[in-house]
Amino acid sequence: MKSKENPDDILSKYKVYLRLEKSLSDNTVSAYLADISKLFQFLKDEQIHPFDVTLDNLETFSANLRDLGIQPRSQARILSGIRSFYHYLILEDYLQADPSELLESPQTGLHLPEILTLEEIDTLIESIDLSTNEGQRNRTILETLYSCGLRVSELCNLKLS
């Protein structure tokens, strides 16, 4: 088992792992690192090294998220990132046991996205001034989003070929 390292050094190595081994997007990596940073701040306040964490510590952290008014879906995402981090620590032989293994996420319930009606979409597209290059670009963007059912992040990652 590897010796205790500075949490910032561990976080840097974890970032490389997420990008190279897991092939996650920059946005996802940033979200994971922000979530782990929240945990690290909690652990620092409690004077606990990330390698010394117990399930009780993680449950207390989870309760703090709830007390801060963070929505269950966001809590679940944060806890998922923490589980991924501790899985990484096991893989890299920093830890022998995973303290997050039995950590439960809050119930998130079924959330259906709100969608625009056909009339609303038509009104939106027709309101664009097509006499400018920007207007033509914006109409193309909206029609692509709508017709393909893309998220904005997916649209931004499209490559011309």
Predicted feature descriptions by range:
Residues 1-161:
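Conserved catalytic core of the tyrosine transesterase superfamily
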